[in-house]
């Protein structure tokens, strides 16, 4: 199988960024919305000036104005803007045109998720499919029914499709059986609320081993 793209999200300190920058992740994510992992654009700019990051950088937003997202994206030179709220396809299209960034739409695993993928598909570059947990936009560490992964990827064909929720070193091989194109995680590589180098390495080792055996 092809190795999935890997995104480490919810980076919230200089130390987190230093560890993630040295990891095998392809994407690093910062959350600019209300969350226990929320960071300020000003702090992120300082950290990015101190750490050499040779990865794609994503900013996560929830129901933020297009003007604010565009300003932050340009200031931080974001590669990806991830929309995690109630944004509409027209918002994604406008943001894409204004910033030149890749636009990803986060969707929750629900009965209508494939229809939502179809609704957004022409206006975004990728999707993040996460668990549906009442009162939460993501970062819960709860997995959804991964047997739905092939269906979602088929619906999103031609676009990036990341799977989030409940991914950690112990569950990674179960997810890999469904051949996800991308994996997005935050709490699964954290210890005491901070990114943990040992958990990152363990997850990467298990993923690499599974992929090499499956080739």
UniProtKB/Swiss-Prot annotation:
GO molecular function: phosphoribosylanthranilate isomerase activity
Biological processes per GO annotation: L-tryptophan biosynthetic process
Annotated CDD domains: PRAI (cd00405)
Pathway annotation from the record: Amino-acid biosynthesis; L-tryptophan biosynthesis; L-tryptophan from chorismate: step 3/5
Disulfide bonds: none
Annotated InterPro entries: Aldolase_TIM, PRAI_dom, RibuloseP-bd_barrel, TrpF_fam
Superkingdom as given in the UniProt entry: Bacteria
E.C. designation(s): 5.3.1.24
Catalytic activity: N-(5-phospho-beta-D-ribosyl)anthranilate = 1-(2-carboxyphenylamino)-1-deoxy-D-ribulose 5-phosphate
Keyword terms of this UniProt record: Amino-acid biosynthesis, Aromatic amino acid biosynthesis, Isomerase, Tryptophan biosynthesis
UniProt xrefs under SUPFAM superfamilies: Ribulose-phoshate binding barrel
HAMAP family on file: PRAI
Family: Belongs to the TrpF family.
Protein name: N-(5'-phosphoribosyl)anthranilate isomerase
Lineage, broadest ranks: Bacteria, Bacillati, Bacillota, Bacilli, Bacillales
Encoding gene per record: trpF
